[in-house]
């Protein structure tokens, strides 16, 4: 530890820390623009100047390492004058257009100019003006406001892992731009908006919509992937205006994916706001009572074993649990959250989780990807892995036809024999796995989405056992899930095998990806919030609330249950999921023993211990899975997906549609350059 004095008070701080960090630890406010705790140090804005005794000039505190016996002053006349000078330089070419800037009210430059600026301007020459750069459909630029802090450049390089933003020219003529002014290629590019300290980078979908003080903030969870990123929903009245990240060091740090951030406009389109019944081949708007009575009559006319329920990809645990209880009361055990027919072993909880945990990947030294498209399935997790690779702390190898990643990967091939050789210890990478202290395997849908998924999973378990990847001090076996609801559904046993051909009544709880051709003779009830495939195939439609319109628990891929809070009211005559299921039970005169959300959660916590530990990861058992199924010789390949359209909300998002179009245009432009 190093001892130093800051404004007369002695503190201790670890060696290697900066003067800025020491000042913050001492409780001092140090203005800054270029410094960001999660980015590499640049030291180019000079706003964080402090006075250090025996130094003739003020020092940039963010770039100066501490040394023993340092005496630092943060509030002397020299420091004040230096900061005023720096601020004056920063404002020389700034347009001062705060009334029309989207950053107004939450702008670092505004706040620090007021707190540390002179209040007068001696510059009366013409200001420079810079042409706005095109960065795609998500980021709106106003580059005349840019103060060249380079935060966005460092984020692109160090966090996103794609070097697609840089600076051209020098001095006063310096400009920040994307290469060839193309659409940004990163799935987490929207985070540049958050870290920009001025109004140079803004959200295009949010442009000129609202001011910060007009918005209500609601803590929630991103449901468009299985990572469970913490988000903040900003709304005005009953309209969602924007979505921002909330800090959670164990999951998403301070970042979220572009899909979780921008696809909220999909909540405006194709919404189901009234109950419907199919009459004479056409869906007709009806009252709730008529829809519920029709369902009651149909359920009573069908044998219990012919009734099945399928949950979709963004359904809360409470809704699935309540529907499961209802079906059990009816005498049916046909219910599943596995609408894609994934081959996932559920014999123990550790067999279907991401056991290493998201933050735990920073401890791993060797990672094997098998059939996993981690960049598009879990962009935030991918960013963590990429940062470890770039500093040389982690080596990543891959089996399976993959997709372009944001870091260096060594491809072993796509043959199943590679896994067989690893399992018996004859592959060239056997030595690397034996020497690795913390090896991990990430299994994607290129494995559990195959017809022989169980057989392949059994083979992978042999590799896990061979290299002792699951032990008391390290859990290296990981399933990379695609959807927000699947782990929660597996946790409550909402996962029985269903033969669709024999189903006479299908209850679709937001499920749109099932084999509808096998349900041609079934009566279909669709409970959901968007008019997608499921609604178009339904005989009765029950409009429900989206995840922003009701509170619900979601369990992320590492097994952490979290609560998404209600931000706005349901549209039209739509109701919350558990309210609809409770009303159906009432019409059937079935007592499911739960009248409200609180009672559902109390019962969940009693029956499943994990739900008594919200926001926590519990210890889980893992057992080796053995399958007698036959392996095919089909090459392993991660399943291709359209990243921007993976669920009913993102499919109906205009912003996501623009992203798809922009990415296609980028591919065509790149092809022109190289071919």
From Swiss-Prot:
Explain how, and how many, cofactor molecules are bound.
Binds 1 [2Fe-2S] cluster per subunit.
Q: Which Gene3D superfamilies match?
A: 3.10.20.740, 3.30.200.210, 3.30.70.20, 3.40.50.740
Q: Where are the transmembrane segments?
A: none
Q: Which InterPro entries match?
A: 2Fe-2S_ferredoxin-like_sf, 2Fe-2S_ferredoxin-type, Mopterin_OxRdtase, Mopterin_OxRdtase_4Fe-4S_dom, NADH_UbQ_OxRdtase_75kDa_su_CS, NADH_UbQ_OxRdtase_ferredoxin, NADH_UbQ_OxRdtase_Gsu, NADH_UbQ_OxRdtase_Gsu_4Fe4S-bd
Cofactor(s) demanded: [2Fe-2S] cluster; [4Fe-4S] cluster
Instruction: Give GO terms: molecular function aspect only.
Output: 2 iron, 2 sulfur cluster binding; 4 iron, 4 sulfur cluster binding; metal ion binding; NADH dehydrogenase (ubiquinone) activity; quinone binding
Q: Which UniProt keywords apply?
A: 2Fe-2S, 4Fe-4S, Iron, Iron-sulfur, Metal-binding, NAD, Quinone, Translocase
Residues of the 4Fe-4S His(Cys)3-ligated-type domain: 78-117
What chemistry does it catalyse, as a reaction equation? Answer: a quinone + NADH + 5 H(+)(in) = a quinol + NAD(+) + 4 H(+)(out)
Which stretches make up the 4Fe-4S Mo/W bis-MGD-type domain?
A: 215-271
What does the entry list as the binding residues for [4Fe-4S] cluster 2? 146, 149, 152, 196
Q: Which EC number applies?
A: 7.1.1.-
| PROSITE patterns (alphabetical) | 2FE2S_FER_2, 4FE4S_HC3, 4FE4S_MOW_BIS_MGD, COMPLEX1_75K_1, COMPLEX1_75K_2, COMPLEX1_75K_3
- For the ligand ([4Fe-4S] cluster 1), the binding residues are 94, 98, 101, 107
The record's listing under SMART domains reads: NADH-G_4Fe-4S_3
A single GO cellular-component term on record:
membrane
Where in this chain does the record put each 2Fe-2S ferredoxin-type domain? 1-78
Residues reported to bind [2Fe-2S] cluster: 34, 45, 48, 62
Q: Which family does it belong to?
A: Belongs to the complex I 75 kDa subunit family.
Q: What does this protein do?
A: NDH-1 shuttles electrons from NADH, via FMN and iron-sulfur (Fe-S) centers, to quinones in the respiratory chain. Couples the redox reaction to proton translocation (for every two electrons transferred, four hydrogen ions are translocated across the cytoplasmic membrane), and thus conserves the redox energy in a proton gradient.
Query: What's the protein called, per UniProt?
Result: NADH-quinone oxidoreductase subunit G
């Amino acid at each position: 530890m190093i001892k130093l004095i800051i404004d007369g008070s002695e503190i201790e701080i670890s060696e290697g820390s900066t003067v800025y960090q020491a000042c913050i630890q001492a409780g001092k406010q140090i203005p800054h623009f270029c410094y960001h705790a999660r980015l590499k140090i640049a030291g180019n804005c000079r706003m964080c100047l402090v006075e250090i005794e025996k130094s003739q000039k003020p020092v940039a505190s963010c770039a100066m390492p501490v040394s023993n016996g340092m005496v630092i002053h943060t509030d002397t006349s020299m420091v004040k004058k230096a900061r005023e000078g720096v601020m004056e330089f920063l404002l020389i070419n700034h347009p001062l257009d705060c009334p029309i800037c989207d950053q107004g009210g939450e702008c670092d430059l505004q706040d620090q100019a007021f707190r540390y600026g002179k209040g007068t301007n001696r510059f009366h020459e013409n200001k420079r003006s810079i042409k706005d750069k095109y960065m795609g459909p998500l980021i709106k630029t106003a580059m005349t406001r840019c103060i060249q802090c380079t935060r966005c450049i460092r984020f692109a390089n160090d966090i996103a892992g794609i070097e697609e933003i840089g600076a051209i020219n020098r001095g006063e003529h310096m400009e920040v731009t994307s290469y060839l002014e193309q659409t940004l290629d990163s799935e987490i590019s929207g985070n540049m908006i958050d870290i920009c300290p001025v109004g140079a980078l803004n959200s295009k979908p949010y442009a000129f919509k609202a001011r910060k003080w007009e918005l209500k903030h609601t803590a929630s969870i991103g449901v468009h992937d299985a990572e469970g990123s913490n988000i903040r929903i900003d709304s005005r009245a009953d309209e969602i205006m924007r979505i921002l990240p909330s800090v959670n060091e164990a999951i998403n740090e301070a970042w979220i994916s572009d899909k979780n951030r921008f696809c909220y406009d999909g909540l405006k389109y194709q919404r189901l706001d009234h109950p419907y019944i199919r009459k004479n081949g056409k869906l007709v708007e009806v009252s709730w009572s008529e829809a519920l009575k029709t369902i009651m009559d149909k359920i009573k006319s069908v044998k219990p074993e012919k009734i099945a329920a399928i949950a979709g990809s963004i359904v809360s645990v409470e809704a699935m649990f309540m529907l499961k209880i209802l079906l059990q009361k009816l005498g049916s055990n046909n219910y599943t959250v596995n609408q894609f027919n994934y081959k996932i072993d559920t014999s123990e909880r550790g067999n279907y989780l991401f056991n290493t945990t998201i933050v735990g990947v920073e401890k791993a030294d060797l990672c094997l990807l098998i059939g996993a498209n981690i960049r598009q399935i879990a962009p935030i997790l991918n960013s963590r892995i990429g940062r470890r690779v770039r500093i040389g702390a982690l080596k990543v190898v891959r089996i399976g036809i993959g997709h372009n990643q944001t870091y260096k990967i060594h491809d072993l091939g796509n043959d199943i024999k590679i896994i067989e050789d690893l399992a018996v210890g004859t592959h060239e990478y056997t030595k690397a796995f034996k020497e690795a202290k913390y090896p991990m395997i990430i299994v994607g849908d290129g494995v559990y989405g195959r017809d022989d998924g169980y057989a392949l999973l059994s083979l992978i378990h042999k590799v896990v056992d061979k290299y002792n990847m699951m032990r008391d001090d390290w859990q290296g076996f990981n399933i990379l899930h695609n959807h927000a609801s699947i782990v929660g559904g597996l946790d409550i046993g909402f996962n029985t095998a269903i033969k669709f051909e024999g189903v006479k009544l299908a209850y679709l709880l937001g499920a749109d990806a099932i084999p509808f051709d096998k349900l041609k003779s079934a009566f279909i009830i669709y409970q959901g919030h968007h008019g997608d495939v499921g609604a178009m195939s339904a005989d009765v439609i029950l409009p429900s609330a989206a995840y922003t319109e009701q509170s619900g628990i979601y369990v992320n891929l590492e097994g952490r249950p979290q609560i998404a809070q209600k931000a706005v009211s349901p549209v039209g005559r739509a109701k919350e999921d558990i309210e609809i299921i409770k009303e159906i039970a009432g019409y059937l005169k079935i007592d499911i023993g739960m009248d409200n959300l609180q009672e559902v959660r109390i019962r969940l916590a009693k029956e499943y211990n994990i739900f008594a530990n919200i926001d926590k990861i519990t210890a889980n058992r893992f057992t080796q899975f053995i399958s007698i199924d036959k392996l095919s010789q089909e090459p392993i390949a991660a399943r291709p997906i359209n990243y921007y359209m993976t669920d009913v909300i993102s499919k109906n998002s205009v912003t996501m549609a623009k992203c798809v179009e922009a990415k296609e245009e980028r591919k065509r432009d790149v092809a022109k350059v190289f071919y």
